Amino acid sequence: MATSQRKILVTSALPYANGPIHLGHMLEYIQTDIWSRYQKLRGHECHYICADDAHGTPIMLKAQQLGIAPEDMIAQVNKEHQQDFADFNVAFDNYHSTHSEENRLMASDIYLKLRDNGYIKSKSISQLFDPEKSMFLPDRFVKGTCPKCKSPDQYGDNCDSCGATYSPTELINPKSAVSGATPVMKDTEHFFFDLPAFEGMLKEWTRSGALQVEMANKLDEWFEQGLQQWDITRDAPYFGFEIPDAPGKYFYVWLDAPIGYMGSFKNLCAKRPELSFDEFWGKDSTAEVYHFIGKDIVYFHSLFWPAMLHGSGYRQPNSVYAHGYVTVNGAKMSKSKGTFIKARTYLDHLDPEYLRYYYAAKLSSRIDDLDLNLEDFAQRVNSDLVGKLVNLASRTAGFITKRFNGKLAKINDTTLTEAFLAKQDVIADFYESREYGKAMREIMALADIANGFVADAAPWQMVKHDDQQEAAHQVCSNALNLFRILVTYLKPVLPRLAQDVEAFFQLPLTWDALSQDLAGHEIAPFKAMMQRVELDKVNAMVADSKDNLQVTADAPKTAAPEKTAEASSVSSEPLVDDPISETINFDDFAKIDLRIARIIKAEHVADADKLLKLQLDIGGETRQVFAGIKSAYSPEDLEGKLTVMVANLAPRKMRFGMSEGMVLAAGPGGSDLWILEPHEGAQPGMRVK
């Protein structure tokens, strides 16, 4: 038992309930599960909760296209999500849904407290409205001809063909992506959360140690720009919770989504009467609350969420831990390459423990992207887990069973055991601080020592000589005891292997029992515990991921409008989908001033689904450009890169600020979009000719 038991509540971000889990998602759930399992292994009271994020226009429209009720659709997705997580050995204490009575009551409670405390404002805004569906249209649900390059079938906030950004009212011949009708402007009353009122509290909290330094530094940029009131309203029809005392008005999905952490814990408390909700969420709570999230949702979790909690009389989280994205083979996950791998596709081919270990071996406390290099993945798992760890037992256990009645000897020389036990605090600190990669390196260094000990002693030679039987018994017993310590250290990462090893030793693996004397203890006959990664299975997984893409492309188009097939897959013949434009003369071309630019800063734009704000150095001058590339790049990936911009494009006033040019990109759009990157020999300000 740990010296003093902690009370801990830990969460992962809620997956959206309109599609399957993929390996990019799995990074976060594996990272959180390892941390939760470690806390429990140390004897702490730790509750790991999550839920499906089950509200919003995309879910409503997808259910309509499928011809089923949204409730039925999210119930099926919830079942699939839970099965994927269970098969990856992610051990939630509770997995719920934001579309629950607990969450409705919590969202209403928080909203009413914010309203009563003066933090909710109302004002009239103008939005495009679909007269046929009688619904207001978010930007991404309006399509038309780009006002800049005249490409048809573009979204209401940016053009996938030329990268231009604009407002929906600027589209030529705008149409509702829901019904095809021509939208009209209509006024509506919306409620806003007064985020600026919490600026002082948020500045203090974000610098309190609750966030990684990278996150806190990034949030300073939002403070410099000035916090804005946050629109928390959506108009009917909408799949979500109706706002109290406001018929036809619904909570925006990002209001009730983080409240889903509280709703899920409420649900757990109902199942476990010994748990107290207020003990974890009350304003004066001394319990610990931690959120694990992706770096793309830092803004919501580090500004809106703590402010909402503070304004409604609840405690703030102790920490919000962000992680980077997953790349595969050094590039963004790609459906066309077969590297956009669903969790279920992986599970159809490979052991989930392989991925748990590989992610752990590459994870740190920083917000770095993690590359799943499939060749390195196979080599590392085969070397570390099969060649070092399991091999330690497989090469010694048989002698104990066959020659020594399955019983372990009392170890006379405990030098190695003491050296292994001396590392427990170092490894514990690495788990606690989320430095899993460092923990794995420490453990594998110990595995190398243990294997070297066995190789030098060569018990397979000893057993051939009558006078060396006891020495062989000592070596094999010592090796198996070291194996037990190693697997105990790895138990948070490899729970299924740990379970098999517990059956082999016929006793539980606990941190408190690391130094247990197993003299005379009987072990079970050794059984194979882990197979090598076979590259043909890895290749089959990639091939099946490509097949899944083809099935999707051939299937009826049931996806929500913002996820059209054209936007999510790469055409094998770009000129077929996007023919060459009409010929222009040289004088027209010469008017365009293309310059090399270095991206010196990139950041998210609040309430913009596709935009990133870029600060571009063009050689002695800095330009601000809003680029519709958020679906393909995170800000951190762009900073420092060279690109090409249209430098003499007239500045355009947008609701987010002034855009002073355009960066160039290629690709059909969505995640398949690539900015142009000149050779490093080019310098900012150089003209492209």
Curated annotation (Swiss-Prot):
GO MF annotation list: ATP binding; metal ion binding; methionine-tRNA ligase activity; tRNA binding
Binding sites annotated in the UniProt record for ATP: 335
Record motif 'KMSKS' region, residues: 332-336
Residue ranges of the motif 'HIGH' region: 15-25
Superkingdom classification of source: Bacteria
GO cellular component, one term: cytosol
Name recorded for this polypeptide: Methionine--tRNA ligase
Species of the source: Shewanella baltica (strain OS185)
